[in-house]
């Protein structure tokens, strides 16, 4: 009996090895293994190679687990049934004692295998899959060598079944932006990433999705020089609006000549020379980009052209705004470089905010914790959202209710929404989804 018990514990150990091997090799993260492989870990390279063809080691694992389970049942019955049968034979008939002995020995062996050969090793493998995989990879390679004929047979039959049902046989480990978002979110929740680091990483990915109008200075806010403007007017504009660069146009903003650098104008003033643009002031060529460009593409354009200032035009060759490298970096770095800028979203109290109409919709989503605005591809700013929902040129007191918030127009500047009051509704969870834009516009205009 002692020999049988020893054999059972050996079988449990073998089964535990296959269980921990299966879960650790399957759960090991490819990114972490690649880092270890780049540092020179040969075992990490071997684990990666085995993960490329998981059918091989899964076949070995299943052969081992099933063989050990069958042997465990046979040995367990032979080891414990006679002892239980002898014990129960004093109290019941031989037939009944044999049946009860078989049930008890089966339950005992099964319990031992479940606890020590399955649950415990698999939980260990899940806790530290990469560390375990690096330790068991060489014994697993030896098992692959020993069972190669059986592996070839069963793996070949499994591959034919996969081909029959057109199931891919290689695991796809393509990493998407959503995967990285999830990892970053998990890192923030776990405290591994600080709030600023979390926001910075999110902003990096937003550069690919946000277009230049979301960060530009809009057309009506551009301070520009007319080519024939007198010197006093130019000095007044420079004094009132101390920008580093000024657009130069001919009669109107849509006829662009170029731009002048404030440093060049200052040098002329210090040299007692005229600031008039037709008196020899250097007018530089302007980088012009379409309004469909993403911020990431705008960065590439700045790099290629060697500029940090660009004019944004729409499909009708009309100027819609200007964007600078600093605008893009402010979007990327947030508060780290935008300390001196006027806040676009100002909290009045814990349930209300004053929001600039030109605030990018992504910034509003982040502050108000709104997952998505309806048909957000049709607008870039919160003012655009209001016009889209109202289906008209907005006026003061016009409002829209969405996602548990009331968005109310409080200030208009030349038909443009200058400021909104956003209020959190008490019954946020019960607020219905917004109606179709036409219906919503009629409802709000009647309010």
Swiss-Prot record:
Q: Where in the cell does this protein reside?
A: Cell inner membrane
Q: Which cysteines are joined by disulfide bonds?
A: none
Topology: which residues are Periplasmic? 26-54, 121-141
KW Cell inner membrane (keyword) present: yes
Q: List, alphabetically, the PROSITE patterns matched.
A: CBS, CNNM
One Pfam entry name: CNNM
Domain (CNNM transmembrane): residue spans on this chain = 1-197
The UniProt record lists the CBS domain at 216-275, 282-343
Q: Which InterPro entries match?
A: CBS_dom (IPR000644), CBS_dom_sf (IPR046342), CNNM (IPR002550), FAD-bd_PCMH-like_sf (IPR036318), FAD-bd_PCMH_sub2 (IPR016169), Ion_transp-like_CBS (IPR044751), Transptr-assoc_dom (IPR005170)
Q: What does this protein do?
A: Involved in cadaverine and putrescine tolerance in stationary phase. May facilitate the efflux of both cadaverine and putrescine from the cytoplasm, reducing potentially toxic levels under certain stress conditions.
Q: Which PANTHER family match?
A: HEMOLYSIN-RELATED, POLYAMINE EXPORT PROTEIN
Official protein name in the record: Polyamine export protein
């Amino acid at each position: 009996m002692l020999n049988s018990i020893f054999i059972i514990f050996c079988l449990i150990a073998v089964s535990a090895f296959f269980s921990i091997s299966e879960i650790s090799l399957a759960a090991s993260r490819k990114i972490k293994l690649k880092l270890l492989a780049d540092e020179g870990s040969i075992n990490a390279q071997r684990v990666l190679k085995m993960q490329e063809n998981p059918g091989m080691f899964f076949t070995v694992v299943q052969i081992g687990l099933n063989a050990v389970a069958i042997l465990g049942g046979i040995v367990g019955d032979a080891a414990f049934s006679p002892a239980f049968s002898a014990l129960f034979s004093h109290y019941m008939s031989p037939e009944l004692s044999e049946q009860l002995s078989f049930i008890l020995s089966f339950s005992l062996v099964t319990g031992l295998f479940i606890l020590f050969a399955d649950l415990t090793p698999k939980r260990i493998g899940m806790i530290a899959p990469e560390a375990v995989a690096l330790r068991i990879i060489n014994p697993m390679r030896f098992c692959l060598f020993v069972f190669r004929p059986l592996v070839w047979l069963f793996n070949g039959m499994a591959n034919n079944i996969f081909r029959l049902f057109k199931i891919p046989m290689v695991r796809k480990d393509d990493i998407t932006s959503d995967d990285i978002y999830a990892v970053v979110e998990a890192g923030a929740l776990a405290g591994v990433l600080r709030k600023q680091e979390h926001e910075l990483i999110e902003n990096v990915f937003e550069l690919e999705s946000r277009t230049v109008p979301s960060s530009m200075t809009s057309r009506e806010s551009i301070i520009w020089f007319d080519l024939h403007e007198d010197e006093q007017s130019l000095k007044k504009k420079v004094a009132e609006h101390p920008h580093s660069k000024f657009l130069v146009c001919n009669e109107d903003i849509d006829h662009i000549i170029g731009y002048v650098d404030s440093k060049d104008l200052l040098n002329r003033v210090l040299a007692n020379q005229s600031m008039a643009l037709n008196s020899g002031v250097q007018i530089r060529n302007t980088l012009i980009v379409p309004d469909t460009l993403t911020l990431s593409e705008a960065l590439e354009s700045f790099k290629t052209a060697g500029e940090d200032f660009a004019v944004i035009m729409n499909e009708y060759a009309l100027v819609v705004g200007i964007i600078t490298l600093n605008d893009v970096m402010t979007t990327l770095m947030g508060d780290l470089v935008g300390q001196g800028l006027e806040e676009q979203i100002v909290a009045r109290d814990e349930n209300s905010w004053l929001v600039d109409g030109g605030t990018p919709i992504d910034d509003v989503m982040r502050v108000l914790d709104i997952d998505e605005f309806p048909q957000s591809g049709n607008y870039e700013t919160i003012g655009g959202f209001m016009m889209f929902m109202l289906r008209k040129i907005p006026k003061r007191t016009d409002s829209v209710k969405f996602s548990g918030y009331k968005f109310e127009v409080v200030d208009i500047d030349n038909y443009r929404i200058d400021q909104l009051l956003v209020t959190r509704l008490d019954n946020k969870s019960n607020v219905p989804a917004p109606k179709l834009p036409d219906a919503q516009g009629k409802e709000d205009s009647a309010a």
